[in-house]
């Protein structure tokens, strides 16, 4: 047989909680493997996502080439089908019981074949990989199908695609169809690779219950330039949405004899919390970890409600409490707690047992003394980065101690910081005690991850929630009791309708809320609901049954973590039966992929599970070097076909050091820190529907469907009195070149609509405190910043509708949408379409916020941290007459006096009763980005 040419890999990675697709490949001209068609079809119905990825490749080389197909999945997504079509012959993947598949796997390994499918994990992801040799001129079609129930987090559902084909693809198309009978309340898209040309390939259509998003770029739109054959498709494509909700008992949807019940009441008062933060300050937390923990804890403390009670416990070898009992979240107590948290230093061992038991003891004492408010929610939030090393170190004994101490009274949430944390230990301890575990990835955004987790549990609305259905109507119902419901999340119950059940399904949801018990009721007509799901365009039929099966499997796998003996055996038998019946790859099943004769005959896909060292377990023949989870937007590691050598796993030595960094991976990047801005006074309720509903459903460009923003009423203090001095020749503003005649860069250039002057430039001489630069209640806009020496050390833009905040430093951008924080790096392309607002960033580092009838705000990073940031403005004619602020005042009825003779380079400008001296000068303007342009403007100083 002819030997294959050097291995070539093309990757397709998809992730959906999200839906993520990464498509790295090399060009056909260099390697012969050409992707001539790539399609992604994702259909979301009732939060259940069914994704089909189809890729067609051809070998245009004169020799055999190897193509490798990779798919990266979220942990909670299940592969349900995979096939390869080679020369008209279909080679399917077959789901089998784990033991049966293992026999074929072992036999293949015995023949010297690399039968395992290589998997590594990123942030909550798993990788699926299949390789196959492709003869010259031959074509091959790969098709992968996987399914997932999207979870609502911080008020939104999210689908994410990473697109990186690394070559031009003749037919590239992504279609996302969403059907939500409740009605789509908000729809957003975001991309990190979109150019103005590619934006024309994106279309979005939406009516009351349906949305269709299509991305279909031509070859020319994919090109970096006319002279280059490289593609610009290299980044993320994200869709976020939410649905309409009523104050009733939720929404019941029925299809083909199965039902799903979604319940997420929003307009309820928040229950008071009793929360204890248990913070690991052992030696392994030193450096960046403890710095980010302090930063996050300070911001979390400031988010506590006055009705909450709290305390802090820091632990290393010993556990120390901040106060002897829980204290009210008054301004005075919060300031003291912030001061205490800011001084936490890392040293010593890790005594998890004593720390958590001390937290339980504090709650018990307050409970016995009747100091905890009636119908309040008690939470313990544990943050640690490793195994227990001091005191009780046996994980099982610690879990038993904690479970017995809590005894169902409180909820424990465990946050595992870093790659080597014993996550299964924390997960079991949390699930045993009515909470959940979350891994915090060690990266530049770790503090944001901590804040986002807290925001998920910050607003409890209900506790002791129970769903109830008539016994003659339903059977085989999934979990129907929940300890808590938090604002921004959703409870989901699914089940099967009985054959001779009633025509109307009744449901009752009961729970405890602030100061009282409450019961919700809802009903659904079986016939009417069945009719809703007859549309063939948006629905993959029989999806409700698969939704029920998937949710049942996920919940039983979660129960399996805490089960033992006969209960464990029964759960595993149920999971196995459902997995085989519905063709799901789960921890108890494998998918066996066969190949053409003459190649490796078998590859086996299995669902990875976390083991005691926190790493994902891989097939023995497929273990690879440790994988450092990528930051969103960074390029995933490429694993070549020839690199499947077995590398020892990280073991006890790694965990003992607790500061180990795998060879070849630098420590997490990031600035040494950035000034913390003052928090905003608060945010309004979530915005309403972003797009007009109607009967028309034609495809229209996304940017054409943005709506203007309504007025936002607000009260702001009067403008401060500003003192103007004549411009000094020893200006502290740096020059662009050593040439003293070169134009200087002003702090900000203010385009004045309809003004007879050229332009107005404003230099800020000194600012000890953050400045309110613009406050425009009618625009729903506020811009604040801190000016230091030669530039802004930080700038913050707050927009009321849609609710958005951008906090910028020279090192990074943090965008807060609702309660979710997302980090972006400068000079990474960004294109985000929100209701009534567009947010874009180009490769030069110019971020712009724009919208119909809105002032365009630009933020520009000047590369040099000492020079800071620049604030740019356009479309200033949209400022209202109510605009205020240090710079906003220049847009309110200013009066220019005639220039002063004899050289006409000085004049007076009157602003709000104050005279300013303006000097005519040449300046370097970055209004249009780099490299800047020389302008003549009248300069004033404040």
Curated annotation (Swiss-Prot):
Ranges for region Disordered: 658-698, 726-745
Origin organism lineage: Eukaryota, Metazoa, Chordata, Craniata, Vertebrata
Keywords on record: Acute phase, Coiled coil, Disulfide bond, Glycoprotein, Protease inhibitor, Secreted, Serine protease inhibitor, Signal
Segments passing through the bilayer: none
UniProt feature, compositional bias: Pro residues: 663-690
Gene3D superfamilies per record: von Willebrand factor, type A domain
Single GO cellular component term: plasma membrane
Subunit and partners: Interacts (via C-terminus) with DNAJC1 (via SANT 2 domain).
VIT domain mapped to chain residues: 29-148
Subcellular location: Secreted
Gene of this entry: Itih4
Matches recorded under SMART domains: VIT, VWA
GO MF entries: serine-type endopeptidase inhibitor activity
Role noted for this protein: Type II acute-phase protein (APP) involved in inflammatory responses to trauma. May also play a role in liver development or regeneration.
Keyword Glycoprotein found: yes
Protein name, entry field: Inter alpha-trypsin inhibitor, heavy chain 4
Keyword Signal attributed: yes
Coiled-coil regions, chain positions: 552-586
GO annotation, biological process: acute-phase response; hyaluronan metabolic process; response to cytokine
């Amino acid at each position: 047989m002819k030997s294959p040419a050097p291995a070539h890999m093309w990757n397709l990675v998809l992730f959906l909680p999200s839906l993520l697709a990464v498509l790295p490949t090399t060009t056909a001209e260099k390697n012969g493997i050409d992707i001539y068609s790539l399609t992604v079809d994702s259909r979301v119905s009732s939060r259940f996502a069914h994704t089909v990825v189809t890729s067609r490749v051809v070998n245009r080389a004169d020799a055999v080439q190897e193509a490798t197909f990779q798919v990266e999945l979220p942990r909670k997504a299940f592969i349900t089908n995979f096939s390869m079509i080679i020369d008209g012959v279909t080679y399917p993947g077959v789901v089998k019981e784990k033991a049966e598949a293992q026999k074929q796997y072992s036999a293949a390994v015995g023949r010297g074949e690399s039968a395992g499918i290589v998997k590594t994990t990123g942030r909550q992801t798993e990788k699926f990989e299949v390789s196959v040799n492709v003869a010259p001129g031959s074509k091959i079609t790969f098709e992968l199908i996987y399914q997932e129930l999207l979870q609502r987090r911080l008020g939104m559902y999210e689908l994410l695609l990473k697109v990186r084909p690394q070559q031009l693809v003749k037919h590239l198309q992504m279609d996302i169809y969403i059907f939500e009978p409740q009605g789509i309340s908000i729809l957003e898209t975001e991309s990190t690779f979109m150019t103005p040309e590619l934006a024309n390939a994106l279309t979005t259509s939406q009516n009351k219950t349906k949305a269709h998003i299509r991305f279909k770029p031509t070859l020319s739109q994919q090109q970096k330039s006319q002279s280059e054959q490289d593609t610009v498709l290299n980044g993320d494509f994200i869709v976020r949405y939410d649905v309409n909700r009523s104050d009733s008992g939720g929404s019941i949807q029925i299809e083909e004899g199965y039902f799903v019940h979604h319940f997420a009441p929003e307009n309820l008062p928040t229950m008071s919390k009793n929360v204890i933060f248990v913070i690991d300050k052992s030696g392994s937390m030193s450096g960046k970890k403890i710095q980010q923990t302090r930063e996050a804890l300070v911001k979390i403390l400031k988010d506590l409600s006055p009705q909450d009670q709290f305390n802090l416990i820091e632990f290393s070898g010993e556990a120390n409490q901040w106060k002897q009992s829980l204290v009210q979240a008054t301004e005075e107590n919060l300031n003291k707690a912030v001061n205490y948290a800011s001084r936490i230093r890392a040293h010593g061992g890790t005594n998890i047992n004593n720390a958590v038991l001390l937290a339980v003891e504090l709650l018990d004492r307050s409970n016995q003394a009747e100091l905890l408010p009636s119908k309040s929610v008690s939470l313990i939030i544990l943050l640690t980065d490793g195994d227990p090393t001091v005191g009780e170190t046996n994980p099982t004994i610690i879990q038993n101690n904690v479970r017995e101490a809590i005894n169902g009274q409180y909820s424990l949430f465990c946050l595992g910081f870093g790659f080597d944390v014993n996550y299964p230990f924390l997960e079991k301890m949390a699930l045993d005690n009515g909470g959940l575990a979350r891994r915090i990835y060690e990266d530049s955004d770790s503090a944001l991850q901590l804040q986002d987790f807290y925001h998920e549990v910050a607003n409890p609305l209900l506790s002791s929630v129970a769903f109830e259905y008539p016994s003659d109507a339903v059977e085989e119902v999934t979990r129907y009791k929940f300890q808590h419901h938090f604002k921004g999340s959703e409870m989901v119950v699914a089940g099967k309708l009985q054959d001779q059940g009633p025509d109307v399904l009744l449901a009752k949801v009961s729970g405890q809320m602030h100061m009282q018990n409450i019961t919700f009721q809802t009903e659904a007509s079986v016939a009417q609901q069945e009719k809703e799901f007859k549309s063939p365009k948006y629905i993959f039929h029989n999806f409700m049954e698969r939704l029920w099966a998937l949710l049942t499997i996920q919940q039983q796998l979660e129960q399996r973590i805490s089960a033992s003996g006969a209960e464990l055996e029964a759960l595993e038998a149920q999971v196995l039966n459902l997995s085989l019946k519905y063709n799901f790859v789960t921890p108890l099943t494998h998918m066996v992929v066969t190949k053409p004769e003459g190649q490796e005959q078998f590859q086996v896909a299995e669902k990875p599970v976390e083991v005691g060292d926190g790493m994902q377990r891989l097939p023995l023949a497929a273990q690879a070097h440790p994988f450092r989870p990528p930051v969103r937007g960074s390029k995933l590691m490429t694993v070549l076909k020839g690199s499947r050598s077995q590398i020892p796993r990280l073991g006890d030595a790694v965990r003992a050091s607790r500061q180990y960094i795998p060879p070849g991976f630098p420590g997490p990047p990031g600035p040494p820190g950035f000034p913390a801005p003052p928090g905003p006074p608060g945010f309004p309720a979530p915005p309403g529907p972003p797009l007009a509903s109607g009967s028309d459903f034609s495809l229209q460009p996304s940017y054409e469907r943005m709506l203007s923003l309504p007025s936002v009423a607000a009260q702001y203090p009067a403008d401060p009195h500003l003192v103007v001095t004549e411009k000094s020749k020893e200006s502290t503003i740096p020059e662009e070149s050593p040439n003293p005649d070169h134009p200087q860069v002003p702090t900000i250039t203010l385009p004045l609509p309809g003004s007879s002057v050229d332009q107005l430039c404003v230099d800020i001489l000194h600012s000890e405190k953050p400045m309110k630069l613009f406050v425009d209640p009618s625009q729903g806009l506020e811009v604040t910043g801190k000016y230091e020496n030669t530039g802004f050390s930080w700038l913050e833009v707050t927009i009321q509708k849609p609710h958005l905040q951008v906090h910028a430093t020279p090192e990074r951008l943090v965008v807060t949408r609702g309660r979710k924080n997302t980090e972006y790096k400068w000079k990474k392309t960004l294109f985000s379409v929100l209701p009534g607002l567009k947010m874009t960033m180009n490769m030069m580092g110019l971020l712009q916020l724009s919208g119909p009838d809105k002032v365009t705000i630009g933020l520009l990073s000047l590369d040099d941290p000492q020079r800071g940031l620049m604030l740019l403005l356009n479309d200033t004619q949209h400022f209202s007459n109510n605009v205020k602020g240090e710079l906003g005042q220049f847009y309110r009825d200013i009066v220019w006096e005639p220039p002063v003779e004899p050289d006409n380079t000085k004049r007076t400008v009157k602003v709000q009763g104050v005279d300013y001296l303006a000097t005519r000068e040449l300046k370097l303007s970055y209004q249009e980005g780099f490299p800047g342009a020389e302008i003549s403007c009248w300069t004033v100083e404040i």
